[in-house]
UniProtKB/Swiss-Prot annotation:
InterPro entries: Odorant/phero-bd_Lep (IPR006072), PBP/GOBP (IPR006170), PBP_GOBP_sf (IPR036728). This is General odorant-binding protein 1. Pfam families: PBP_GOBP. It comes from Bombyx mori. Disulfide bonds join C37-C72, C68-C126, C115-C135. Present in the aqueous fluid surrounding olfactory sensory dendrites and are thought to aid in the capture and transport of hydrophobic odorants into and through this fluid.
Length: 164
Protein backbone atom coordinates (compact mmCIF):
# COMPACT_ATOMS: atom_id res chain seq x y z
CA UNK A 1 0.00 0.00 0.00
CA UNK A 2 2.78 2.46 0.92
CA UNK A 3 4.53 1.76 -2.37
CA UNK A 4 1.38 2.75 -4.24
CA UNK A 5 1.09 5.99 -2.24
CA UNK A 6 4.75 6.83 -2.91
CA UNK A 7 4.42 6.07 -6.64
CA UNK A 8 1.27 8.19 -6.92
CA UNK A 9 2.89 11.06 -5.02
CA UNK A 10 6.00 10.96 -7.22
CA UNK A 11 3.85 10.89 -10.36
CA UNK A 12 1.82 13.88 -9.15
CA UNK A 13 4.96 15.85 -8.34
CA UNK A 14 6.53 15.01 -11.70
CA UNK A 15 3.36 16.14 -13.46
CA UNK A 16 3.31 19.42 -11.54
CA UNK A 17 6.99 20.02 -12.30
CA UNK A 18 6.42 19.26 -15.97
CA UNK A 19 3.59 21.82 -16.05
CA UNK A 20 5.83 24.49 -14.50
CA UNK A 21 8.64 23.73 -16.95
CA UNK A 22 6.24 23.97 -19.89
CA UNK A 23 4.99 27.32 -18.55
CA UNK A 24 8.61 28.47 -18.21
CA UNK A 25 9.32 27.52 -21.84
CA UNK A 26 6.17 29.26 -23.11
CA UNK A 27 7.01 32.37 -21.05
CA UNK A 28 10.55 32.59 -22.41
CA UNK A 29 9.40 31.88 -25.96
CA UNK A 30 6.71 34.55 -25.76
CA UNK A 31 9.20 36.98 -24.24
CA UNK A 32 11.43 36.78 -27.31
CA UNK A 33 9.18 39.35 -29.00
CA UNK A 34 9.59 41.92 -26.21
CA UNK A 35 12.57 43.76 -27.69
CA UNK A 36 10.81 44.10 -31.05
CA UNK A 37 7.70 45.47 -29.34
CA UNK A 38 9.44 47.92 -27.00
CA UNK A 39 9.22 50.93 -29.30
CA UNK A 40 5.76 50.22 -30.67
CA UNK A 41 4.33 49.97 -27.16
CA UNK A 42 6.37 52.95 -25.88
CA UNK A 43 7.92 50.81 -23.18
CA UNK A 44 10.80 52.52 -21.40
CA UNK A 45 13.97 50.57 -20.62
CA UNK A 46 12.93 50.62 -16.96
CA UNK A 47 9.47 49.19 -17.65
CA UNK A 48 10.98 46.64 -20.01
CA UNK A 49 13.26 45.53 -17.17
CA UNK A 50 10.22 45.23 -14.89
CA UNK A 51 8.57 43.01 -17.48
CA UNK A 52 11.18 40.33 -16.84
CA UNK A 53 9.74 39.99 -13.32
CA UNK A 54 6.23 39.13 -14.56
CA UNK A 55 5.98 36.02 -12.36
CA UNK A 56 7.17 37.81 -9.19
CA UNK A 57 4.47 38.27 -6.56
CA UNK A 58 5.10 42.00 -6.46
CA UNK A 59 4.82 42.60 -10.23
CA UNK A 60 2.42 45.51 -10.77
CA UNK A 61 -0.18 45.58 -13.53
CA UNK A 62 -0.47 49.37 -13.47
CA UNK A 63 0.92 50.70 -16.72
CA UNK A 64 -1.09 50.68 -19.94
CA UNK A 65 2.06 50.33 -22.04
CA UNK A 66 2.64 46.88 -20.50
CA UNK A 67 -0.71 45.83 -21.93
CA UNK A 68 0.28 47.36 -25.27
CA UNK A 69 3.54 45.40 -25.17
CA UNK A 70 1.67 42.15 -24.47
CA UNK A 71 -0.69 42.97 -27.34
CA UNK A 72 2.26 43.59 -29.68
CA UNK A 73 3.99 40.39 -28.57
CA UNK A 74 0.77 38.43 -29.08
CA UNK A 75 0.40 39.90 -32.57
CA UNK A 76 4.04 39.04 -33.30
CA UNK A 77 3.16 35.36 -32.81
CA UNK A 78 -0.27 35.76 -34.47
CA UNK A 79 -2.09 34.89 -31.24
CA UNK A 80 -4.82 37.55 -31.54
CA UNK A 81 -7.84 37.98 -33.75
CA UNK A 82 -8.58 41.26 -35.51
CA UNK A 83 -10.59 42.32 -32.44
CA UNK A 84 -7.54 41.71 -30.19
CA UNK A 85 -9.04 38.60 -28.61
CA UNK A 86 -7.16 35.33 -28.28
CA UNK A 87 -6.99 33.30 -31.49
CA UNK A 88 -7.61 29.87 -29.98
CA UNK A 89 -6.19 27.75 -32.81
CA UNK A 90 -2.99 29.78 -33.20
CA UNK A 91 -2.49 29.93 -29.43
CA UNK A 92 -2.89 26.16 -29.26
CA UNK A 93 -0.25 25.71 -31.97
CA UNK A 94 2.09 28.19 -30.27
CA UNK A 95 1.90 26.42 -26.90
CA UNK A 96 2.26 23.00 -28.51
CA UNK A 97 5.41 24.19 -30.31
CA UNK A 98 7.26 23.90 -26.99
CA UNK A 99 8.40 20.59 -25.47
CA UNK A 100 5.42 18.95 -23.74
CA UNK A 101 3.23 21.92 -24.68
CA UNK A 102 0.33 19.60 -25.39
CA UNK A 103 0.16 18.95 -21.63
CA UNK A 104 -0.85 22.54 -20.86
CA UNK A 105 -2.28 23.91 -24.08
CA UNK A 106 -5.98 23.42 -23.40
CA UNK A 107 -5.66 24.44 -19.76
CA UNK A 108 -3.88 27.68 -20.67
CA UNK A 109 -6.38 28.48 -23.41
CA UNK A 110 -9.28 27.88 -21.03
CA UNK A 111 -7.72 30.12 -18.36
CA UNK A 112 -7.03 32.94 -20.84
CA UNK A 113 -10.51 32.64 -22.33
CA UNK A 114 -12.11 32.82 -18.88
CA UNK A 115 -10.08 35.93 -18.13
CA UNK A 116 -11.00 37.48 -21.48
CA UNK A 117 -14.69 37.02 -20.74
CA UNK A 118 -14.23 38.73 -17.38
CA UNK A 119 -12.76 41.87 -18.96
CA UNK A 120 -14.54 41.81 -22.32
CA UNK A 121 -16.32 45.11 -21.69
CA UNK A 122 -13.04 47.08 -21.41
CA UNK A 123 -12.94 49.12 -24.66
CA UNK A 124 -9.21 49.92 -24.58
CA UNK A 125 -7.31 46.92 -25.94
CA UNK A 126 -4.12 47.65 -24.00
CA UNK A 127 -5.89 47.98 -20.65
CA UNK A 128 -8.06 44.91 -21.34
CA UNK A 129 -5.06 42.79 -22.30
CA UNK A 130 -3.21 43.96 -19.19
CA UNK A 131 -6.17 42.92 -17.00
CA UNK A 132 -6.38 39.56 -18.80
CA UNK A 133 -2.64 39.03 -18.19
CA UNK A 134 -3.08 39.79 -14.49
CA UNK A 135 -6.05 37.42 -14.27
CA UNK A 136 -4.09 34.71 -16.13
CA UNK A 137 -1.12 35.10 -13.78
CA UNK A 138 -3.44 34.81 -10.77
CA UNK A 139 -5.04 31.68 -12.25
CA UNK A 140 -1.59 30.16 -12.88
CA UNK A 141 -0.53 30.91 -9.31
CA UNK A 142 -3.71 29.35 -7.90
CA UNK A 143 -3.29 26.20 -9.99
CA UNK A 144 0.44 25.84 -9.31
CA UNK A 145 1.49 26.50 -12.91
CA UNK A 146 3.47 29.69 -12.37
CA UNK A 147 7.22 29.19 -12.77
CA UNK A 148 9.43 30.64 -10.06
CA UNK A 149 11.59 33.64 -10.87
CA UNK A 150 14.61 31.50 -10.00
CA UNK A 151 13.64 29.00 -12.70
CA UNK A 152 13.04 31.75 -15.29
CA UNK A 153 16.30 33.55 -14.47
CA UNK A 154 18.34 30.34 -14.48
CA UNK A 155 17.03 29.46 -17.94
CA UNK A 156 17.54 33.03 -19.16
CA UNK A 157 21.17 32.96 -17.97
CA UNK A 158 21.75 29.56 -19.59
CA UNK A 159 20.33 30.83 -22.89
CA UNK A 160 22.48 33.98 -22.68
CA UNK A 161 25.60 31.89 -22.07
CA UNK A 162 24.73 29.60 -24.99
CA UNK A 163 24.41 32.61 -27.31
CA UNK A 164 27.99 33.74 -26.59
Amino acid sequence: MWKLVVVLTVNLLQGALTDVYVMKDVTLGFGQALEQCREESQLTEEKMEEFFHFWNDDFKFEHRELGCAIQCMSRHFNLLTDSSRMHHENTDKFIKSFPNGEILSQKMIDMIHTCEKTFDSEPDHCWRILRVAECFKDACNKSGLAPSMELILAEFIMESEADK
